[in-house]
């Protein structure tokens, strides 16, 4: 058998940044302590509390813009017709042309 074939293992402490929970496991990592973002004790999936995200997708953004435009058009006052007389708006038959 070859000597020094496996990496040396040591006890490494992992510490959660959000809940300060720490646990120690055997690992081949060279660092003695590693900070992780979230662990199983504070992760929403593992504790059973799923939080609703406030990030909206493309469809919600588009519908928000559409509703804002609709509200703007409802509050807008209609413009008067510029100089159109009854003669131009009246439909003519082919005989009149």
From Swiss-Prot:
Matches recorded under Pfam families: Ribosomal_L31
Q: Which GO terms describe its molecular function?
A: rRNA binding; structural constituent of ribosome
| Compositional bias segments (type: Basic and acidic residues) | 83-97
- Cellular component per GO, a single term: ribonucleoprotein complex
One GO biological process term: translation
Which controlled-vocabulary keywords does the entry list?
Ribonucleoprotein, Ribosomal protein, RNA-binding, rRNA-binding
Q: Which SUPFAM superfamilies does the entry mention?
A: L28p-like (SSF143800)
Q: Where is this region: Disordered?
A: 76-97
Per the record, the coiled-coil ranges are none
* Similarity remark: Belongs to the bacterial ribosomal protein bL31 family. Type A subfamily.
Family matches, as NCBIfam families: L31, PRK00019.1
Quaternary data: Part of the 50S ribosomal subunit.
* PANTHER family recorded: 50S RIBOSOMAL PROTEIN L31, CHLOROPLASTIC, LARGE RIBOSOMAL SUBUNIT PROTEIN BL31C
Query: What does this protein do, in the record's words?
Result: Binds the 23S rRNA.
Name listed for the protein in its UniProt record: Large ribosomal subunit protein bL31
